Amino acid sequence: MATALNSKNASSNTAVHIEPKTGIAFPVKLDDGKSLNSVGLRKKSLLGMGIKVFGFGLYADNEKLKNLLKLKIGKSPAKPTEEMYQLVIDGDIGLTHKIVIAYSGLKMNMFKKAFSEALGESIMKLNGGRKNEELANKVLGPASDQIKLATGSEMEISKLPGYVLETKVHGELASRVESELLCRAYFGIYLGEITMECYKESKEMFGQSMLSLF
C-alpha cells in the first residue's frame, strides 16, 4: 500500500494495517503471498444511524498485477484510471477480499441475503440486464444459517487462477465456483466504475497502491 504499514500485531509480530473507522487490524501479507492494497468499511443506515457492518481488506498478487499494468498501461499515469481498475477486475490475477465483522447484531441469514442481492445486481450489470440469482447464491448459499457471526468473525472471498471464486467462513471452505462472470461481478462491486459511496475511499487507496507498482 502507498501508506505506511509499520504497525505490529503484538501476539505474532506480524505487520498489520489498521482500518481507522473500525480499528480492525489487517495483515499486510496473507499466507499465500498476496499483499494488502487497501482497507475499507461497509456502512448501512438503520433507523437514521450509520451502522458499521464490516471492515475489509483488498489483497492482490502484486507481482502479476505489476506485470499486467506495465504490459497494458506502460508508464505510470498521474492518477489511477478506470482502465487500471478494469484490468484488475477482468484479469486472471489472484485477489482476496478479507471481511471482518464489526456489527455484533448481524445474523448469517441477514448477511447472506444482503450479500447475494448486491452480487446479483453486479452480475446483472455485466449480463446485459439479465438476472442470475442461481449464480449469485452459489457463493454464500452453501454456508449454514446457523454459523455465528460475532464481532471479529472473518470471511475470505478469493479469485483463484482460472477465474475460480473461493469463499471461506471462519477459515472453512463454503464454496468454490468457476465462473469468470462471477469473479468480475464480485470484485466489480468494490473496484468498478460505479461503486457505493462507502467503497470509494478504499477504491482510491487500491488505485494509489497500483501506481506504486510502476
UniProtKB/Swiss-Prot annotation:
It is found in: Cytoplasm. Its EC number is 5.5.1.6. It catalyses: a chalcone = a flavanone. One of its GO terms (cellular component) is chloroplast stroma. Mostly expressed in glandular trichomes (lupulin glands), and, to a lower extent, in cones, cones bracts, leaves, stems and roots. Belongs to the chalcone isomerase family. This is Chalcone isomerase-like protein 1.
